[in-house]
Amino acid sequence: MALSAAIVLAAGEGTRMRSNKPKVLHAFAGKTFLNRVMDSVAVLNPDTLAVVVHFQAERVAEAARSYDEQVTIVNQDDIPGTGRAVQCAMAQLTEAGKVDGPVLIAASDMPLLDSETLHRLVEFHTASGNGATVLTTILDDPTGYGRIIRDREGNVLRIVEQKDANRSELAVQEVNTSVYVFEASVLTEAIAGLKSNNAQGEFYLTDALETAKAAGKVGAFAAPDPLTVEGVNDRVQLAALSKTYNRRVCERWMRDGVTILDPETTWIEDDVQIGRDATILPGSFLQGHTVVGEDAIVGPYTTLIDTTVDEGAVVERSRVQESHIGARTNIGPWTYLRPGNEFGEDAKAGAFVEMKKAHIGNGTKVPHLSYVGDAQLGDHTNIGGGTITANYDGVHKNSTTIGSGCHVGAGNLFVAPVEVGNNVTTGAGSVVRHAVPSDTMVYSENTQHNVEGWKPAWER
């Protein structure tokens, strides 16, 4: 099964999204609509992958190139319609000598369009000897979709858009999904005769099927799962499709041995991995390339972004970005871990702790009310509440190193850059500005002054 070219239509604005950015750049389960469709199309390994752009063309083109540097960008002119988009694409590809064989055409507003459905569509097209094949589906409510009109023998006659359909045509439940396979020669001939004499005043690609009948057989392949070809036109549809899909994702993980107490409030993106016997509690969001190990507990009300949580760890009511949580380590509640943290095993970051680029050793605990940034903490060290590593001098971030076996008193301030050795004890309220050797106790001599008979200003 060789595809000469794949054309992804991404030129539209998507006005019903009411957005300042193109519809194709909205996110679904962690990826843009455009990238999700490009993902599925790329699996078929077409000789050429082209993306047609128009509205905010540079922005969409940049998104496409960030996915695939070799993608061919086609700029659609101001003549509207999907038919015109394909005319522009075929003209550019033909001039470059990049098209001779089956051509896949797909809209970019179907975030669940999958490679398996596309593979079966192309196989059906080739096996049937069709000049053109349209991917269809059956909907209980086909409102808004182009209807597939067949003859008495079941052959595809044409596709009628919603605004151009008569009463009997509107009753048809088989609809066009805006995904097609054409033989290049048939497509070239079919799009040459497109006209804009319709309610929208656009060049419809659907009209090309009628012309294609004269050049080759036209067929239809029904998508096995209607969800894979469901389009998104507004944010209401986006929310509904996201919820349906997320429920499927949660069910898949539950069948694979993961406990999810409330799938309705648990959101898991596609690239997340979860180990057996892990538990995900309500209100949790697992995003990006997050990995949750076996027997780990996440939640409730926790967000993990590109984070690895090893086996047996617990992350409760916290937000964690680009960090690694070691085995049996406890995070939370109300902990904020910014990017770059590395926790050993059996460690702890407790309530109202913020960390950034911190290396926390095995068994080391930062129980509460502390900021640890650009710091290395050894093994089995305890950090008292209210401790701050002052890492920023106004220009540069500086590092704090605290060794193993240390006991840091409450309310300590470490003015970086500073190094503290192993087995060091610091007194409460200490300000540590200079290096401290191992096996040392350090404290700041802050003199307490009592002013007797004092009255606050408002009582004087």
From Swiss-Prot:
Cofactor: Mg(2+)
Family that this chain belongs to: In the N-terminal section; belongs to the N-acetylglucosamine-1-phosphate uridyltransferase family. In the C-terminal section; belongs to the transferase hexapeptide repeat family.
Region of interest called Pyrophosphorylase, as start-end residue ranges on this chain: 1-235
Active-site positions on this chain: H368 (proton acceptor)
Top-level class of the enzyme under EC nomenclature: transferase
Pathway entry: Nucleotide-sugar biosynthesis; UDP-N-acetyl-alpha-D-glucosamine biosynthesis; N-acetyl-alpha-D-glucosamine 1-phosphate from alpha-D-glucosamine 6-phosphate (route II): step 2/2; Nucleotide-sugar biosynthesis; UDP-N-acetyl-alpha-D-glucosamine biosynthesis; UDP-N-acetyl-alpha-D-glucosamine from N-acetyl-alpha-D-glucosamine 1-phosphate: step 1/1; Bacterial outer membrane biogenesis; LPS lipid A biosynthesis
Secretion signal, residue range per the UniProt entry: none
Annotated residues for binding of Mg(2+): D109, N233
Residues engaged in binding acetyl-CoA: N391, Y392, A428
EC assignment: 2.7.7.23, 2.3.1.157
General function of this protein: Catalyzes the last two sequential reactions in the de novo biosynthetic pathway for UDP-N-acetylglucosamine (UDP-GlcNAc). The C-terminal domain catalyzes the transfer of acetyl group from acetyl coenzyme A to glucosamine-1-phosphate (GlcN-1-P) to produce N-acetylglucosamine-1-phosphate (GlcNAc-1-P), which is converted into UDP-GlcNAc by the transfer of uridine 5-monophosphate (from uridine 5-triphosphate), a reaction catalyzed by the N-terminal domain.
Residues reported to bind UDP-N-acetyl-alpha-D-glucosamine: 9-12, 23, 76, 81-82, 146, 161, 176, 233, 338, 356, 371, 382
NCBIfam families: glmU (TIGR01173), PRK14352.1 (NF010932)
Compartments where found: Cytoplasm
Chain segments carrying region Linker: 236-256
Subunit-level organization: Homotrimer.
Reactions catalysed, as given in the entry: alpha-D-glucosamine 1-phosphate + acetyl-CoA = N-acetyl-alpha-D-glucosamine 1-phosphate + CoA + H(+); N-acetyl-alpha-D-glucosamine 1-phosphate + UTP + H(+) = UDP-N-acetyl-alpha-D-glucosamine + diphosphate
Protein name, entry field: Bifunctional protein GlmU
Keyword check for NADP: no
Keywords on record: Acyltransferase, Cell shape, Cell wall biogenesis/degradation, Cytoplasm, Magnesium, Metal-binding, Multifunctional enzyme, Nucleotidyltransferase, Peptidoglycan synthesis, Repeat, Transferase
Gene3D superfamilies membership: Hexapeptide repeat proteins, Spore Coat Polysaccharide Biosynthesis Protein SpsA, Chain A
